Amino acid sequence: MVALAEFRATVREWLADNLSGEFAALRGLGGPGREHEAYDERVEWDRHLAAAGWTCLGWPVEYGGRGASVEERVVFHEEYARAGAPARVGHFGEELLGPTLIALGTDAQRARFLPPIRRVEELWCQGYSEPGAGSDLASVSTSAVLDGSGDGAEWVITGQKVWTSLAHVAQWCFALVRTEPGSTRHAGLSYLLVPMDQPGVEVRPIEQLTGGSEFNEVFFDGARTPADLVVGEVGGGWRVAMATLEFERGASTLGQQVGFRRELDALIEVARDTGALDDPVVREKLTRARIGLDVMRWHALRTIGDAAGASVTKLVWANWHRGLGELAMEVLGAAGLVHGGDLSDWQRLFLFSRADTIYGGA
């Protein structure tokens, strides 16, 4: 415990020293629904983190990580959130694809992709959902057909992905596609690594209710990727895709909950300022929200490393956060229903939290 306390102090001190100067203006930027904010500056921040050794904490040392324990990763995410540090831009590579390649990739794939992920030199997006395959992910229809043989063989990809976060700025996409014609459901799927900067890829940003456009439609029309950029076995992509989702629901959720507590504390102050706190029904709902947040934290701590438990944690926090958005509108009353052009933070929270139970796997 002493070592963990010292690690927490080190993280806290480093963040205090470095979230200053050119990076001071980034505090609090880039959260859900606001991923477009100060994007280039946040890339530089991520690279600053990488240079100091604060990216890829949980990766094994032999792959460029710190080999940090689960407890240390939890501490880092909590302190990162408490410091108000900006949302990361390299998280798809660092937290999803990187661990997937370490667990299931080839030596060549790890050698090619892990170093630039760690240094935040190549950014990734996740090509899962399609117009006809969202929560029912096994219904994906985007196809990939092998063209040629030997070292020059390539997969030719045709189809559409949607709700693809940050596809408009990513250099690469890890995509779930159907490589066995005539196959259905979980069979016949493969997990491909696809370069985005090529003639066969078109990206169209989707404007959201919040005004942001970090989600995208991605169209593959004869896009190509080398045959050896299949992660896992050809036809075994479902297993790989599910492994990626398990990594997505890891230790970072504890840091996310620090942000939730900050939102709840701010809402309590709004209720106090507006007089809504005098309403016993509002007080009860705020109290229940605080209790729910504590339950969420203890459940997340208890189930770290357990895939099924992590899925339950996702369900718990998604419903809690959506409820917070609804409670914010109740506290604000009529003021929550109107705006003069730009959405308030509370309106943005309410609108974006409607998607919490869907994104990241329903």
Residue ranges and their predicted role:
Residues 140, 153-204:
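A short core secondary-structure module
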Residues 88-108, 134:
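N-terminal glycine-rich flavin-associated loop
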Residues 268-269, 284-305, 318-330:
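Loop-to-helix element that buttresses phosphate recognition and phosphoryl-transfer chemistry
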Residues 66, 308-311, 315-362:
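Alpha-helix capping/hinge segments and adjacent helical runs
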Residues 201-297, 355-356:
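Glycine-rich beta->alpha junctions and the first turn(s) of the following alpha-helix
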Residues 120-128, 176:
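A short, Trp-centered hydrophobic/proline-enriched beta-strand micro-motif
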Residues 142-146:
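A structural signal for short hydrophobic beta-strand segments in well-ordered beta-sheet cores
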Residues 1-89, 112, 116-119, 341, ...:
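Amphipathic, small/basic residue-rich leader segments at the start of a protein or domain
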